[in-house]
Amino acid sequence: MEPIKIIQGPQTKKNLPNFLSPANCRPAHEYHRSLDVYQPTPLVPLPALARRLGVKAVYIKDESYRFGLNAFKGLGCTYAIHQSLAQHPEKTPVFVTATDGNHGRAVAWAAARLGGKAKIFMPKGSQPCRVEAIHAIENAEATVLDMNYDQAVLYAFDYANRHGYTAIQDTGFEGYEQVPNWITQGYTTMTKEALAQMQQYGTQRPSHVFVQAGVGSFAGGVTGYLAHVYGEKLPHITIVEASPAACLYRSIECGDGAPHSITGDPETIMAGLNCGTPNLFTWP
């Protein structure tokens, strides 16, 4: 097993991203509460682990209960598709994305719930069971490409533009900002839930937060939202990546304040973390 590598990431932006303020995220939270399938997922205390580590408490947010999708991804996709339909009613309700994990299934599920269709592109090496899970959703198509994840993202974006469809991708880049930001705002519903649940357990605020990262939309959303809530009392936040696809780590390591990609065809045990390019709008 490789040793764990840790690097300190300085905040290089003078101002917090305004789209992640509690006020600007509130519409996403309210939308989720309006869904008939919505309920907060459990925040599970781990007292034995806390005793072993010598800390007051350890909590884990169990997203396996979210919308029956076994992942938090539905939070971002439902809100982004809802907003896309509301703001662009003239567009054909077909939603396109690239996925190497749960994101594509969540897009297909959300599109079907809202009366649309989904076209999902998957990188080479995608597990057949993941392809089948998407095909099982009404009005959803899944196609495996001979490309890595980052190449599949660009292919899906181009496909959506050529056909007049809507790309629902959490990877943001120049010229594609609004949808990824809606997705990131959707993820903050989980953070808001967790903070309220901690208080019910008698913990007023977290001292440390651990989040995983692929392109960094989820990690950036959690971090940005907490930064707005706590200001100078922001908890210590640790972002955990798979070593073959550690694009955030590499970006910090380069030290120039810019996002940097992992090239080639990285492979990770958890498919959803096999992402080589940071989301421009949640970096750093």
Locate each region found by the language model.
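PLP-dependent amino-acid enzyme catalytic core
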Residues: 1-284
